[in-house]
Regions:
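Bacterial N-terminal signal peptides
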Residues: 5-16
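Exported/periplasmic ABC-transporter solute-binding proteins
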Residues: 20-70, 74-81, 90, 94-98, ...
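Phosphate-/polyanion-interacting regions in eukaryotic proteins
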Residues: 86
């Protein structure tokens, strides 16, 4: 009788220990909502991070702002499950204020700058000065820009300040929910403007370069844990990794400028 009870107890203890040990199937899957400007960085980080830490990353494209249903604020407003958001810092601040993202977890990850692209094989015009950029804008038959941070700045601030004339407004178009580079690659716009990190992954275009410093606007890309995340510790660990020196190469390769780590 005692032998039977001992065996039973041993089996129960063994089962309990086995159940407590994590298995590959139990590895958490983090849903990451990423805007285009930092998408290249998280895509570059993902393979090594998943292999090293056993965490699966489900990365979904989602603009930082705009009317499209896929935009991060609209997804969270609908209650879509997510763990991490990677997006334009100013747009993230509003999510923090609205209680959709955790303030304590918010961290800046990289700086981005606006660049111009043409269809692959087309001549690359000079845009090194504001005068050259203005002439290119006047001469181009069609101009495309995004509906996110860079496009809002271009359409509301830079272009109006350049005295481009009424005709310019008829040939300049804001592109929603699609990378500007793809529109240029299809030949639907002669030139396109977007964050360098958003243009770099697009096939079928040539990047002319950054617009001049006098007309440039830096955009900070940041990240935070979603307020209702079910994997808060794992989500925070991913953000800590992306803000560390280990991720610098991946961030720089994507077209963003990594931040000094003394500032973190």
């Amino acid at each position: 009788m005692l032998k039977t009870l001992s065996c039973t107890a041993l089996l129960v203890a063994t089962f309990a220990c086995s159940a407590a040990e994590p298995t590959p199937d139990q590895a958490p899957t983090l849903t990451v909502l990423s805007s285009g400007g930092i998408m290249g960085a998280i895509r570059n980080v993902a393979p090594a991070y998943e292999h090293t830490y056993g965490v699966k990353l489900n990365v979904l494209a989602a603009p930082s702002m705009g009317q499209t249903p896929q935009a991060i604020p609209n997804r969270l407003q609908r209650g879509e499950p997510a763990d991490v958001v990677l997006m334009v810092g100013s747009a993230l601040d509003k999510l923090v204020t609205d209680g959709k993202a955790d303030k304590a977890s918010r961290i800046d990850l990289g700086k981005s700058f606006i660049a111009m692209a043409v269809r692959k094989g087309e001549p690359k015009p000079a845009i090194g000065t504001m005068g050259e950029l203005r002439q290119v804008l006047l001469d181009s038959p069609s101009v495309a820009y995004s509906d996110s941070a860079s496009g809002v700045y271009l359409s509301k601030t830079l272009f109006p300040s350049m005295n481009l004339g009424e005709g310019f407004t008829h040939k300049a178009h804001m592109i929603p929910a699609e990378p500007v580079g793809k529109v240029v690659a299809r030949g639907q716009a002669a030139i396109g403007f977007q964050q360098l990190s958003e243009l770099k992954p697009v096939a079928g275009i040539d990047i002319v370069g950054l617009i001049p410093a006098e007309g440039q606007k830096m955009t900070m890309y940041s990240g935070a844990v979603v307020a209702n995340s079910q994997h808060r510790a794992a989500a925070q660990a991913l953000l800590d990794y992306m803000a560390s020196a280990q991720a610098d190469a991946a961030i720089e390769k994507s077209g963003l400028n990594p931040l000094p780590h003394s500032a973190h």
